């Protein structure tokens, strides 16, 4: 009989990923798997059994091809003529946190469960982050 995970039985770990010199798409896939909990043997699709993920050095990630110049992100407020676009390079320089959240959100379920999963993603520009207490507990075991 297959074991299903229950909410009160889940123990969440804190995983720190260094984005320096990693390919963006492969890193985002790894983050999505950790947030969903698909790396665990008791993965249950209707329960949030994923870990907390802390990404450091977010703006030092690599992109393949000409994506930095060619890829664009669009925003629209709802008013006529208010469509604005930013290139991937601009997004990476100004708001790398938003870039990671947009990419990971596309790989998670579009439900309340997906919203709960994306809240466990913490992204920081450099290698300093305020979650050293949570991550050091895992290293002490």
UniProtKB/Swiss-Prot annotation:
Transmembrane segments: none
Superkingdom field: Bacteria
Source organism per UniProt: Helicobacter pylori (strain Shi470)
Family as reported in the entry's similarity comment: Belongs to the universal ribosomal protein uL13 family.
Pfam family, one: Ribosomal_L13
Oligomer and partners: Part of the 50S ribosomal subunit.
Entry's Gene Ontology BP terms: negative regulation of translation; translation
Disulfide cysteine pairs (residue numbers): none
UniProt keyword list: Ribonucleoprotein, Ribosomal protein
SUPFAM superfamilies: Ribosomal protein L13
GO molecular function: mRNA binding; structural constituent of ribosome
The protein, known as: Large ribosomal subunit protein uL13
Protein task: This protein is one of the early assembly proteins of the 50S ribosomal subunit, although it is not seen to bind rRNA by itself. It is important during the early stages of 50S assembly.
One cellular component (GO) term of this entry: cytosolic large ribosomal subunit
HAMAP family: Ribosomal_uL13
């Amino acid at each position: 009989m297959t074991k299903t995970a229950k909410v009160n039985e889940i123990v969440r770990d804190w995983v720190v990923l260094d984005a320096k010199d990693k390919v963006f798409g492969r890193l985002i896939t790894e983050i999505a798997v950790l947030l969903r909990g698909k790396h665990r043997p008791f993965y249950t699709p209707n329960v949030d059994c994923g870990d907390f993920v802390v990404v450091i050095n977010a703006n030092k990630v690599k992109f393949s091809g000409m994506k930095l110049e060619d890829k664009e992100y669009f925003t629209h407020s709802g008013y006529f003529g208010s469509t604005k676009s930013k290139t991937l390079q601009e997004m990476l320089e100004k708001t790398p946190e938003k870039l990671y959240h947009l990419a990971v959100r596309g790989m998670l379920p579009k439900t309340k469960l997906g919203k709960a999963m994306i809240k466990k993603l913490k992204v920081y520009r450099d290698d300093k982050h305020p979650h050293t207490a949570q991550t050091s507990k895992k290293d002490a075991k």
